[in-house]
Curated annotation (Swiss-Prot):
SUPFAM superfamilies: Glycerol-3-phosphate (1)-acyltransferase (SSF69593)
Membrane topology per record: Peripheral membrane protein
GO terms classed as biological process: CDP-diacylglycerol biosynthetic process; fatty acid metabolic process
Family: Belongs to the GPAT/DAPAT family.
Pathway: Phospholipid metabolism; CDP-diacylglycerol biosynthesis; CDP-diacylglycerol from sn-glycerol 3-phosphate: step 1/3
Key words of the record: Acyltransferase, Cell inner membrane, Cell membrane, Lipid biosynthesis, Lipid metabolism, Membrane, Phospholipid biosynthesis, Phospholipid metabolism, Transferase
Region annotated Disordered, chain positions: 802-825
Motif residue range(s): HXXXXD motif: 306-311
The organism's place on the tree of life at top rank: Bacteria
Entry protein name: Glycerol-3-phosphate acyltransferase
Any one annotated GO CC term: plasma membrane
Annotated localization: Cell inner membrane
Organism for this UniProt entry: Pectobacterium atrosepticum (strain SCRI 1043 / ATCC BAA-672) (Erwinia carotovora subsp. atroseptica)
Length: 825
């Protein structure tokens, strides 16, 4: 580098250091993209900009990557370490590749041809200041003079220097390019052309399409044939004028539609960055690269997160923005459309949806057309398939209405592929968890409003870590091609279609998404410590016992991970415990022997929420432990037989991903891991408890205790009264569960949750144990109940069977009275 250039760079660096605070995407490109700092790198930038180059240089030095401003020397040949693909805006609009970039690519390829051991990493990098997509209809022509471009860059750095990011892309091996494609100038030209297309797609993924002018969007919707027909039907059915019906339609559009604003997003990012840094100790994001790739490949993206808290809306948009992606349009419940939250959310991309569409054809038509328009324009969308926040910490059964509308949008004949992206959202503290516990115990849900929001803000402190894990995407076109090959026959650009395959397909996809969300779960200090303490009947463990139990969980999660997408803590058991104690949920009592970790009674109910977040990760090892403890010695084949009978119930409740064919192998692997940890012994082909580690095994087995008790309740009722109808079975199961929780101190509100028993009874029907004619397959029911009966304590079993007998007697008495009255009549 010449002396004058060094002086120029130093002078330019002074204002950049003050004005620019860029974010690197991904956060650790060395690890996430597989960059090798020890190998030379050719940085490829889209436009000739010294400000961009120096911004990149600062980040490269901070990451330990080669300096892009320093030349690369090899065998006496000196080449620049960076290349600009294009000079930037020109007098003429059409693209002319920068000849210097083509020559430099050719020089590098030629160097690889002459030196077989050389392998330079070509890394595309884009530096962006600001991400405003602009509005439709606004002409924003590119400047025609380089001087104007320089002035624009100056103001961009001045105004948007804090809203900038440096996006690294996956490296391309120039050794591979030279070997596979040759080294002539044609390949160099192709590299420049491909790089230009790459940057164009990357910018669209980061900025998104232009935003609509709201009134013009409404006018377009009103002109659609579907809404015109719905307006005519509204006027006719309600006996009102066409103008009045159209005003009703516009009012509904005003209620539904977002009013997205880049400036609002930028301002909220400042506020949220300040807020998260004070409330959270960190936001952990995993597998975001797969979503960035989808966006860059031109997919229409539908984000489908689990719903834990009202915080989800803000957290997900914040995370996506910081991953270099456009914040999505978010389907929010109409209950959040209150002042001042409603207008703010609307500017951040929220569009509002009512709880039910029944009886309002105009509303459902407008909502469906609006959603279809979002997809057609290329905006990403986010909705919560559970329909509401989970009160138990487990995933809720999916609501399929919005997903059905998504597929109907595809049936309008759009060319853009739509891909569903499941997202697991996890917290170490959910601010609404106290309210959830009250609602599960029967309290009326408090209506959202300004005062409730203020009270909620007062609870925002010491929130620990947050987790956002992107699951395995589900491309809808690929899915439909595989499962409904004839789906394209239903394409109609005018009318919304409801082909016969739509409902079952939507149901299958929704269940698949729930499974994929659980496949990307994040275990953390709070839910692991809660799991351990709630497993103890006294809700207390010594520090040594806590260490052993946490270590058991960690080894299971690391050695036999539930799925490749789950994340387990990298900290040690002691570090996790110290972190959890810092959350002020647990108490420490010291005595002459050591520390005792205590979960206070008032906190125990709340901690079940966090335990339930990851219950599916540990349910199978817990079940193995429970079976071995209660049988003392048992063959693996018998363990597999018993779990295979119970598994469909667990699978439906917890959205487990193992198939029946995979299950035996998984159980064998888990049993081997428990043996490796010396929790079990393997003798003479049988599994047995290892007495020195019995305490850890008992605590592990407790993770499935309440689940088995619930199943025993329902199956006991079926054994006692095989002809009981589904509604009565659910009701009696809940009543008995409430009784059991009082008599045996089961301090978990979800133990008698209506949704849990509804899912259980529905699964029994699906598996053929009960039929629509209210008949039970008695032999199979008794077999499963006997297995469950051996896995619960004698006291609990006695209570269940006593209550079931009473219920049977009441049912018999009621039937006799009915028969007698019929005879007398």
């Amino acid at each position: 580098m010449s002396g004058w250039r060094k002086i120029y760079y130093k002078l330019l660096n002074l204002p950049l250091k003050l004005l620019v605070k860029s974010k690197v995407i991904p956060a650790d490109p060395v690890v996430e993209l597989g960059l090798d700092p020890s190998r030379p790198i050719l940085y490829v930038l889209p436009y000739n900009s010294q400000a961009d180059l120096l911004t990149l240089r600062a980040k490269c030095l901070a990451l330990g990557l080669p300096d892009p401003s320093q030349s690369f020397e090899f065998n006496g040949v000196e080449l620049p370490s960076h290349v600009f693909i294009n000079d930037g805006p020109r007098v003429f609009r059409y693209y002319v590749p920068k000849q210097k970039s083509v020559k430099l690519f050719h020089d590098y390829l030629d160097l690889h041809r002459a030196n077989p051991d050389l392998d330079v990493q070509m890394v595309p990098v884009s530096v962006m200041f600001g991400r405003s997509p602009g509005r439709e209809g606004h002409t924003q022509a590119a400047p025609h003079l380089r001087l104007l471009n320089g002035i624009e860059k100056f103001f961009a750095v001045l105004w948007l220097g804090r809203d900038s990011f440096v996006r690294f892309s996956s490296p391309v091996s120039l050794r591979y390019m030279a070997t596979e494609h040759g080294t002539d100038k044609t390949i160099a030209h192709k590299l420049a052309r491909v790089a230009r297309m790459h940057f164009s797609r990357q910018r669209l993924a980061a900025v998104g399409p232009r935003l609509p002018v709201r009134q013009e969007l409404f006018n377009k919707l009103l002109d659609s044939k579907a809404i015109k027909k719905a307006v005519d039907d509204e006027a006719r059915s309600k006996k009102i004028s066409h103008e009045k019906a159209q005003q009703n339609a516009i009012a509904l559009m005003e209620e539904i539609a977002a009013d997205f604003s880049y400036e609002a997003v930028r301002l909220s990012d400042r506020v949220l960055s300040w807020t998260w840094n004070r409330l959270y100790q960190g936001i952990n994001v995993h597998n975001a690269e797969r979503v960035r790739q989808l966006a860059q490949d031109g997919h229409g993206i539908v984000y489908v997160p689990c719903h834990r808290s009202h915080m989800d809306y803000l957290l997900l948009s914040y995370v996506l923005y910081h991953q270099g992606l456009v914040p999505p349009h978010i389907a929010a419940g109409i209950n959040l459309n209150f002042w001042p939250a409603g207008p703010i959310f609307r500017r951040l991309g929220a569009f509002f949806i009512r709880r039910t569409f029944k009886g309002n054809k105009l509303y459902s038509t407008i909502f469906r057309e609006y959603l279809g328009e979002l997809f057609a324009r290329g905006y990403s969308v986010e909705y919560f398939m559970e329909g509401g926040r989970s009160r138990t910490g487990r995933l809720l059964d999916p609501k399929t209405g919005t997903l059905a509308m998504t597929i109907q949008a595809m049936l309008r004949g759009g060319t853009r592929p739509i891909t569903l992206v499941p997202i697991y959202v996890g917290y170490e503290h959910v601010m609404e968890v106290g309210t959830y516990a009250k609602e599960l115990r029967g309290a009326v849900k408090e209506k959202e409003g300004f005062m409730q929001m203020v009270r909620g803000l007062r609870k925002l402190r010491n929130l620990g870590q947050g987790y956002v894990n992107f699951g395995e995407p589900l491309p809808l076109t690929t899915y439909l091609n595989q499962h409904v090959p004839q789906w394209r026959d239903a394409i109609d650009p005018i009318e919304a279609q409801r082909p016969s395959w739509l409902t079952p397909t939507v149901q299958d996809i929704s269940m698949d998404i729930m499974v994929r969300i659980n496949n990307s779960a994040a275990a953390n200090a709070m839910n692991l410590c809660s799991t351990a303490l709630l497993a103890s009947r006294q809700r207390s463990l010594t520090r040594e016992q806590m260490h052993e139990q946490l270590d058991c969980y960690l080894q299971l999660l690391r050695q036999v991970p539930y799925h490749k997408d789950i994340t387990a803590p990298k900290k040690t058991a002691d570090e996790l415990l110290e972190h959890a104690l810092g959350m002020n949920k647990f108490e420490v009592e010291k005595d002459s022997i050591g520390d005792i970790i205590i979960l206070p009674r008032e906190q125990a109910v709340l901690m079940t929420y966090y335990r339930n977040n990851i219950q599916h990760l540990l349910i199978l090892p817990s079940l193995i432990a429970s079976i071995v403890i209660h049988h003392r010695r048992i063959t693996l084949a018998e363990v597999v037989r018993q779990i295979t009978l119970i598994y469909p119930l667990l699978q439906a409740e917890l959205f487990l991903h193992y198939s029946n064919e995979q299950l035996p192998r998984v159980l064998e692997t888990l049993a081997n891991e428990l043996t490796r940890q010396e929790l079990l012994c393997s003798r003479d082909g049988q599994l047995a408890i290892n007495p020195p580690r019995i305490r850890t095994l008992q605590l592990l087995s407790a993770g499935v205790r309440e689940t088995l008790q619930r199943y025993a309740i329902t199956l006991s009722l079926l054994c006692a009264n095989p002809e009981i109808n589904r509604g009565t079975l659910e009701k009696e199961s809940r009543n008995m569960a409430q009784r059991l929780s009082v008599l045996h101190g089961i301090n978990a509100p979800e133990f008698f949750d209506k949704a849990v028993f509804s899912t259980l009874v529905a699964t029994l029907r699906t598996e053929g144990y009960i039929t629509d004619s209210a008949e039970a397959a008695q032999g199979d029911i008794v077999t499963i109940y006997n297995i469950l009966g051996d896995l619960i304590t004698p006291e609990v079993r006695l209570t269940i069977e006593s209550a079931s007998s009473s219920t049977e007697m009441e049912a018999s008495t009621s039937s006799s009275q009915t028969a007698e009255e019929t005879t007398q009549g």
